[in-house]
């Protein structure tokens, strides 16, 4: 594994942990409802952008929750910048990860 790839993996894990913490304890957006968990974070090699994959459970309106996350991305980014020491704090792009929901659906069928 190249040195840069190992660093990317470490930063991805730190981003995942920190964004999870912010979503759990600090985010106060009324649109973000249900249980939102970060399943994966993937930062670009230039550290300018990070795709954050989230799974949303127990939410009546997944679209509204995703909209709330996108609206709050600036706040989340600022909190990440305070707690993770990076030269460039990446712009956060939230994507819905429905693999957990899909897995639960398959389990119920079996």
Label each region the model flagged.
Residues 1-49, 55-110:
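Charge-rich, low-complexity N-terminal segments
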């Amino acid at each position: 594994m190249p040195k840069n790839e190992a660093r990317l993996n470490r930063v991805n894990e730190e981003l995942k942990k920190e964004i999870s913490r912010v979503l759990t304890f600090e985010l106060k957006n009324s649109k973000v409802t249900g249980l939102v968990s970060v399943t994966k974070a993937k930062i670009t090699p230039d550290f300018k952008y990070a795709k954050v994959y989230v799974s949303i459970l127990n939410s009546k309106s997944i679209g509204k929750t995703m909209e709330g996350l996108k609206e709050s991305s600036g706040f989340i980014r600022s909190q990440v910048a305070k707690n993770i020491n990076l030269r460039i704090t990446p712009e956060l792009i939230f994507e819905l990860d429905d693999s957990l929901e899909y897995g639960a659906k398959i389990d119920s069928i079996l």
